Design a protein with these regions (language model features):
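Short, small-residue-biased leader/transition segments that mark boundaries at the very start
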Residues: 1-4
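Conserved beta-strand scaffold positions in the cores of enzyme catalytic domains, especially
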Residues: 6-8, 51-53, 99-101, 116-117
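Catalytic cores of enzyme domains
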Residues: 10-12
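Short cysteine-rich clusters marking metal-coordination/redox-active sites
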Residues: 17-21, 40-41
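Short, surface-exposed amphipathic charged segments that create phosphate/polyanion-binding patches used
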Residues: 20-27, 130-135
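Short Cys/His-rich local motifs and their 1-3 flanking residues in nucleic-acid-associated proteins
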Residues: 22-24, 43-46, 79
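A general structural motif
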Residues: 30-36, 52-63, 81
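SIR2/sirtuin-family catalytic core signature
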Residues: 62-136
């Protein structure tokens, strides 16, 4: 099985979906990532970025909750922990499971068991890897 599980809660920049079907996605080329009015899916429906905009529902929240409830280590990268429902995922981490938050800015958290790595994503993930290799 997949040891490393992740959930793209707010979508993916290199995917598109139709404005009528957010569940069927299409890969976007990294060399030509722009979407334009008139770009359509195979059914002739306008494509949009596969991204959750502010005010839209977060369709992947239920699968994310299931992953969090079952995780051994919970890692959050780049967040203020102020935007819900995503910020509420911390409520589903089992007691005693390690929580790491990688963000260069100071983040006010309502839990005292979060281990902060105050770096950008690339450097923070490298540091997390070293910490995990030392402790596990």
């Amino acid at each position: 099985g997949d040891v490393y599980k992740r959930q793209h809660l707010h979508g993916e920049l290199l995917k598109a979906c139709s404005v009528h079907d957010l569940n069927t996605t299409y890969d976007i080329s990294p060399e030509n990532p722009d979407l334009h009015i008139g770009d359509k899916d195979p059914h002739g429906v306008q494509l949009r970025p596969f991204i959750v905009w502010f005010g839209e529902a977060v369709p992947m929240i239920a699968p994310a909750i299931r992953l969090v409830e079952d995780c051994d280590i919970f890692v959050v990268i780049g967040t203020s922990l102020n935007v819900y429902p995503a910020a509420g995922l911390l409520n589903y981490v089992r007691h005693g499971q390690p929580i790491y938050l990688i963000d260069p800015k100071e983040v006010k958290a309502y839990r005292n068991d979060i281990r902060f790595i105050r770096k950008g994503a690339s450097e923070g993930v490298k540091e997390l890897k070293e910490l995990l290799l030392q402790n596990h």
